[in-house]
Every structure is written in structure tokens, then in C-alpha cells.
Amino acid sequence: MSHYRSNVRDQVFNLFEVLGVDKALGHGEFSDVDVDTARDMLAEVSRLAEGPVAESFVEGDRNPPVFDPKTHSVMLPESFKKSVNAMLEAGWDKVGIDEALGGMPMPKAVVWALHEHILGANPAVWMYAGGAGFAQILYHLGTEEQKKWAVLAAERGWGSTMVLTEPDAGSDVGAARTKAVQQADGSWHIDGVKRFITSGDSGDLFENIFHLVLARPEGAGPGTKGLSLYFVPKFLFDVETGEPGERNGVFVTNVEHKMGLKVSATCELAFGQHGVPAKGWLVGEVHNGIAQMFEVIEQARMMVGTKAIATLSTGYLNALQYAKSRVQGADLTQMTDKTAPRVTITHHPDVRRSLMTQKAYAEGLRALYLYTATFQDAAVAEVVHGVDAKLAVKVNDLMLPVVKGVGSEQAYAKLTESLQTLGGSGFLQDYPIEQYIRDAKIDSLYEGTTAIQAQDFFFRKIVRDKGVALAHVSGQIQEFVDSGAGNGRLKTERALLAKALTDVQGMAAALTGYLMAAQQDVTSLYKVGLGSVRFLMSVGDLIIGWLLQRQAAVAVAALDAGATGDERSFYEGKVAVASFFAKNFLPLLTSTREVIETLDNDIMELDEAAF
């Protein structure tokens, strides 16, 4: 039986009952897509995920890739390669990709809903199968000649990587020392060592791999502004046919041994270190590497957040299934009666608290990433939110650190609740949750740690934006608070949401005050650093609380209209989880606000030896 538990019903509810993505279908760039098509695709990809994709999930963990230092190659488990090929052969990697690359137009919200299933069933499958998405980025950024290479890469199913990190340049990307030397034929020779490269090699899975590499051209300045982006293939190739030729000078020199996500080969790559030059080509023939790479980074951050959320969802659903069947103890109200019947653990208060917490974050975070995705297509953003393309970009930029940072942190934390639901059984490899936890920890680390996300969120997405995008989202929340949504059944919850909004606005004001005070005392910036992660997490809870209440309002209307059977249970669950979150989590923002408003620099002034 598959470990993966999907929730297509909740996706459909978000997309078409709450967000109104259906309004963007059947016309314009999405004229070939209707609601039935989208529903069918979600059902089909969930079946693929539960079957062929999930089949190698355990084996890939127990028998991870093997590195051969003599050939500088990585050998993947055969079962895992079958899972990757099942996704590629079905064409799911091309959904939402430009038609010029063999793709089909699809709103990003639907695309990410489809991706959720692959990421929840076997996340490394999605990572290895990302070549078409990277080819699209090259197609958008490249020269006319490079656009042809992108088409070849997509048509021939090449693998791909993003190559930023170095041993001494992790979060501090601007410290990168890998250099690029221009050649007479217009190509560049890349020289240096990169580390922590996902899918750096994959044996015979792909005929070729192209690396998008950040390197510093000879004579360029320091920091991120001195970096440029290069296209570096594993094999040089015929530019007309794509047929692979000579081996290029980029080789795997190590594969990391990791806590989780083991089947994803995390590689050290050496460029130009083995007697063969590593030939690369400047992407777009412009020296604008970090800005270009952010096209890749933003896609990666959305993926990481969705991966974390997908993992939490299947973790919760596994825990729920277990709790419904596990009989243990009597009802708490009969605890002194030794003859009382034994009950399933879903009858116990703390198990219910835990399950509802898992449900709140699994479904609230799903709503978060889908809401964010509706700003990733100008046409969808205009129809769904009434915003122009410029504001849509700003709101998407604002939300990405929330999806990635909050999604990764909350999913990892709440997966421990999923494991706890299973008791001692959860600690065993007989159940998938211990692997979920190991696989999910990386999500708060790569593609920018949570602290990096929080600083980006405050300094760039709020301060530099002058609060424009934040004001839009806050305005939507305030509009909901002021509405009569819920037909009289959500008054208490809306009042709690209003207080939470005020608290988050107070946090933003406090952090802004510390930033302004830094003009006279630069150490005031430390207070921003001390409060930024807590602020990001609080914004996440605020938005989750709001989106759950939006769902509850829709559910109340459906219940009032006479929903029956499973549908009635579904909608009742939506009302219950929104109320639970409002009453149990939103009030906690008040204390977080108090902490942020009274921050001091005591720990920054403490001697390091005292830690």
C-alpha cells in the first residue's frame, strides 16, 4: 500500500470554490483549459503519485545513490529511475511550460497543485525531473542561439541543476570565488569548486545535464554584483540536433551523506580541475548573474515551500488514518471505570488537539501556497484579485518568503505531532512519518535559511517596497474582517483575526522603528535581526488564520445550501478548523508583539565566551 495520501478535494475547494481560479479558465491564454480538465488532471497525477512515483520512496532512502570516484559518476537505484521516468513519460514536467518547449499553458495555481502530489509522494523525483522548468528559464533569459539550446534540452529530456554554493560561500553567495575566463570563440572556461548541488549527477538517467552556474568573470568586482550566470553542459553537444559529444570539464568529486532526502544526490562539482576545461556560455550575453539566477531561486523557493506543505499533508493524513483505527484506553470521562469500553484514540482530547493542529497547518499552508500562486500569472491575478501585473509581481515577491520560510518551519514542527499521534509506532520505519521528518528538515535550510527568508521579507519585500504589497494583503484581510462572511457564525473568529492583524501591524511598526533608529545607532539593526524570524512566522499565522476563515465562510454557505454526506463532513471540518485556529493560535500573536516591541541588545552585547 502506498505511503502517500493525497487531498485532491481540498485542492479543488481552494482553487474553484474559494480562490475563483475557474474565472481565468476557458478564455485568453488558458482557453484550452476548463474546470473539468483541471479536476481530471489533479485526479490523474494523484494516482500516478500514489502508485509509480511513491513506489521507490522507501528504497531510495534505504539504498541511496552510490558515488564512483573513478568515473566521477552517481548511480541511482533502478526503482527510483522508474519513478522519475513515470513522471516524465506522462508529461507532467511540461505542464505550465511554454508551448515552444513542448508544454501546455496552465495557471500557476493549478500547476503547483499538480506538483504538490509529486513532491508529497517522492520529492526527489520532482527535483530530478526539473529540466523542462530550467530550460524555460534559459529560454526566457538566453540569446536567440541559447533559446534553441533550451528547446533541445526540453525536447530531449535533459537534466539540470542550479549551481551557487561554494565551501566558503553558502548564505553569503557574494563570497563566491569560482571564476570565468573568456575565450576567443566567445565561450568561457569556468574554474572552481561548488558544493551542495542538488542532482549534480544522475548516472544514465539523462543523456545530458546542463548546469546554470554563478561564477565571477576575470576582473569583475566583489560581492553578488560581480557574479555572472553561465550555461555549462555535462557533455558538449551538436547545437543543431542536441546529440551529446565530448565530455565537458565538470565532474562530481563527492556526494554528501545526509540525514534525509537521501536519494537526491547532493554533489560537490569541480569545474576545470581535471585537465579538461569546463566550457560555459554567458546566459543572455549579459553580466547580470544574481538577478538572472533569482529566476531560478524564486522557482526553487516556491518548490521548497510546496514540498514541505505536501509532506505535512500526507503526514497528517497518515496520522489521522492510524488514530481512527488505534484502540487504546477508555474515554477520559470514564477513566476511573475499569470496565468502560476501550475507544479509538480519536476520542482522547490531546489527540484531537494534535490532529486539529496538523489539519489547520496542512490545509492552511496549502491555502497559502495556492493563494500565492494566483499572483504568478497576470491574467489570473487580474481576474481573481483585480490587480494589475505590476502589483501582482510585488505580492508574489512578498509571499514567497512566507511560503518557503513559514511552510518549511511549520511543516517540520507539525510533522512531529503526526509522529506523536502514532506513539512508539511512529518511531519505527514501518511507518513513513520518521522519513517524512528526516526528508523535511532540509526545507528550512536550503534555498535560503529561515533567517535569510525573514530578512529578505522585511528589508526587501516590505521596506524597499514601501509596504505596497503588504498593504494590499492587509487590505484584503481587513475587508474580510469588516464583512458579514459566515452568516453570523464567524463573528468571534473575525474579531480574533482583527486583533491578530493589529498585532502584526504593531510588530511591523516596531521593526521599522528599530531600522530608523539605526541611522543614529547602527546597533539598533540587531533588534531587527532578533525579531525578523518571529515576525515572519507571525505573518504566516495571520494569513493562515485569514485563509482558513475565508474557507469557513464558503463552507457555511454550502452547509446552509444543504450539503449532505461526505460533503457535509468536509464543510463542517472547514468551519471547525478555522474556529480552532482562530481561538488557539491567533491570540499567541499578542505576546509575540509584546516581545518584539520590547527587544533589547543584551544578548548581542554578551561576550561570546558566556554562551
Curated annotation (Swiss-Prot):
CDD domains: ACAD_fadE5 (cd01153). GO terms for cellular component: extracellular region; plasma membrane. The active site is at E447 (proton acceptor). The keyword Mitochondrion does not apply. It catalyses: a long-chain 2,3-saturated fatty acyl-CoA + oxidized [electron-transfer flavoprotein] + H(+) = a long-chain (2E)-enoyl-CoA + reduced [electron-transfer flavoprotein]; a medium-chain 2,3-saturated fatty acyl-CoA + oxidized [electron-transfer flavoprotein] + H(+) = a medium-chain (2E)-enoyl-CoA + reduced [electron-transfer flavoprotein]; a short-chain 2,3-saturated fatty acyl-CoA + oxidized [electron-transfer flavoprotein] + H(+) = a short-chain (2E)-enoyl-CoA + reduced [electron-transfer flavoprotein]; octadecanoyl-CoA + oxidized [electron-transfer flavoprotein] + H(+) = (2E)-octadecenoyl-CoA + reduced [electron-transfer flavoprotein]. Pathway: Lipid metabolism; fatty acid metabolism. Its EC number is 1.3.8.8, 1.3.8.7, 1.3.8.1. Acyl-CoA dehydrogenase that exhibits broad specificity for linear acyl-CoA substrates, with a preference for long-chain substrates. This is Broad-specificity linear acyl-CoA dehydrogenase FadE5. It comes from Mycobacterium tuberculosis (strain ATCC 25618 / H37Rv). The gene is fadE5.
